[in-house]
């Protein structure tokens, strides 16, 4: 789950990490009220969407007067915004964050994440903040520093001070940096986060460090014990079909192609998409119907796939271990009848009760195309889509 900047800053402040004073507003007049409550300007007005790169898209404005604040908020609120991170998708701007604005002396980068390669929690820091860390890694990798956290020792003050000096900070600032690192570690663990990125972590004209922007990503597997974080979810920022899928507990990700996929198991689902592409097709989605799939779940999966008008064919690829192929076949038949599927459907079944499942499909009288294996199925669905065009 992703978070808005203002939500990230609330959590950072809760854990003693300094952020500029600010508050969200939903109307231009509210934005002016917030600005006045923060004292004398200047101020920053920032559109709240689940994406970075807002500045280049006109979503971050420096304002010297309250008239500027009102004009900036009026221009942003109620619009839709896309950035280089949204892949052309426009996200609604329902809120703006109004904060105090100090003069930036230096921008740094700091993040904490789970490094699956080293199987540790890892810090990444750079003296080059305010830009994409991938760009820094490609052009000046020597400016990136990392620390793998020992689970027994945890993060200590000397780790942060050492990091701070590597980034060119003075003694006072290195001490602040150490405090931020220690508090960030507590936040990361307490809230079951997968990523916290502070970019930039800036030195302002008062000589102190502030988190000017924060990007959070939580571990959805821990949602059951992080009710406060779940309550922060903004579904207006998410793909509508993906929201519906999450409510049905179906793993679904929208993609750009025209061949819908219904598969059980994440690994098989990814392999299915790969084989479709190898055969000249483009998957329209990732959909893992799960190992405990039943008839109703299959029907709901078909509805999700066909909610996109881009889908011109469907490939059902099921390996029945826990799930029974005959039950999947019943679900496919029911779905085709109930949903009124008008695109080619290719089905590959293997595993438990596979012969019973295939017989049900044959006896259904429906134009369901059988496949012997994953490659055969991918070829047939790509061909069927081309022939139907």
Swiss-Prot record:
Name the HAMAP family on file.
Succ_CoA_beta
Q: Name one GO cellular component term.
A: succinate-CoA ligase complex
One of this protein's GO BP terms?
succinyl-CoA metabolic process
Q: Which PANTHER family would you find in this protein's record? A: SUCCINATE--COA LIGASE [GDP-FORMING] SUBUNIT BETA, MITOCHONDRIAL, SUCCINYL-COA SYNTHETASE BETA CHAIN
Catalysed reaction, written as an equation: succinate + ATP + CoA = succinyl-CoA + ADP + phosphate; GTP + succinate + CoA = succinyl-CoA + GDP + phosphate
> Function of this protein?
Succinyl-CoA synthetase functions in the citric acid cycle (TCA), coupling the hydrolysis of succinyl-CoA to the synthesis of either ATP or GTP and thus represents the only step of substrate-level phosphorylation in the TCA. The beta subunit provides nucleotide specificity of the enzyme and binds the substrate succinate, while the binding sites for coenzyme A and phosphate are found in the alpha subunit.
Q: Which organism is it from?
A: Xanthomonas campestris pv. campestris (strain 8004)
Task: Tell me the lineage of the source organism.
Answer: Bacteria, Pseudomonadati, Pseudomonadota, Gammaproteobacteria, Lysobacterales
Q: How is the cofactor bound?
A: Binds 1 Mg(2+) ion per subunit.
What InterPro entries has UniProt attached to this entry? ATP-grasp (IPR011761), ATP-grasp_succ-CoA_synth-type (IPR013650), ATP_grasp_subdomain_1 (IPR013815), Succ-CoA_synthase_bsu_CS (IPR017866), SUCC_ACL_C (IPR005811), Succ_CoA_ligase-like_bsu (IPR005809), Succinyl-CoA_synth-like (IPR016102)
Q: Where does Mg(2+) bind?
A: 199, 213
Keywords of the record, alphabetical order, are: ATP-binding, Ligase, Magnesium, Metal-binding, Nucleotide-binding, Tricarboxylic acid cycle
Q: Which cofactors, by name? A: Mg(2+)
Under Enzyme Commission nomenclature, its number is 6.2.1.5
Give the protein name, as stated in the record.
Succinate--CoA ligase [ADP-forming] subunit beta
Q: Which Pfam families match?
A: ATP-grasp_2, Ligase_CoA
User: How does the annotation summarize its subunit structure?
Assistant: Heterotetramer of two alpha and two beta subunits.
Task: Tell me which residues bind substrate.
Answer: 264, 321-323
The entry assigns this protein to a family as follows: Belongs to the succinate/malate CoA ligase beta subunit family.
Q: Which residues bind ATP?
A: 46, 53-55, 102, 107
């Amino acid at each position: 789950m992703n978070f808005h900047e203002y939500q990230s800053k609330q959590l950072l402040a809760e854990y003693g990490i300094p952020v500029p004073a600010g508050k969200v507003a939903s109307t231009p007049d509210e934005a002016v009220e917030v600005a006045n409550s923060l004292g004398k300007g200047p101020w920053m007005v920032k559109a709240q969407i689940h994406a970075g790169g807002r500045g280049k898209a006109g979503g971050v404005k420096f304002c010297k007067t309250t008239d500027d604040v009102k004009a900036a908020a009026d221009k942003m609120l109620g619009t839709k915004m896309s950035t280089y991170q949204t892949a052309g998708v426009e996200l609604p701007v329902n809120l703006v964050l109004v904060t105090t604005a100090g003069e930036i002396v230096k921008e740094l980068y700091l993040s904490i994440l789970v490094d699956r390669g080293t199987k540790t929690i890892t810090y990444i820091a750079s003296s080059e903040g305010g830009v994409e860390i991938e760009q820094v890694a490609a052009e000046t990798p020597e400016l990136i520093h990392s620390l793998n956290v020992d689970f027994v020792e945890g993060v200590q003050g000397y780790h942060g001070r050492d990091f701070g000096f590597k980034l060119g900070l003075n003694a006072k600032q290195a001490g602040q940096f150490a405090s931020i690192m220690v508090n960030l570690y507590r936040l990361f663990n307490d809230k079951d986060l997968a990523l916290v990125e502070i970019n930039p972590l800036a030195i302002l004209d008062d000589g102190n460090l502030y988190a000017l922007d924060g990007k959070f990503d939580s571990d959805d597997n821990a949602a059951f014990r992080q009710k406060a974080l779940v309550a922060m979810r903004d579904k207006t920022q998410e793909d509508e079909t993906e929201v519906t899928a999450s409510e049905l507990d179906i793993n679904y990700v929208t993609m750009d192609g025209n061949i819908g996929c219904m598969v059980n198991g994440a690994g098989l689902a990814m392999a299915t998409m790969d084989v479709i592409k190898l055969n000249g097709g483009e998957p329209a989605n990732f959909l893992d119907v799960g190992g405990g799939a039943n008839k109703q779940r299959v029907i709901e999966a078909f509805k999700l796939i066909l909610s996109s008008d881009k889908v011109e064919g469907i490939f059902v690829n099921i390996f029945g271990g826990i799930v029974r192929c005959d039950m999947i076949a019943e679900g496919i038949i029911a779905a085709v009848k109930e949903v009124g599927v008008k695109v080619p459907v290719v089905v590959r079944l293997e595993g438990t009760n596979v012969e019973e499942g295939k017989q049900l499909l044959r006896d259904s009288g429906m134009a369901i195309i059988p496949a012997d294996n994953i490659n055969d199925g991918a070829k047939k669905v790509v061909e069927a889509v081309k022939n139907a065009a």
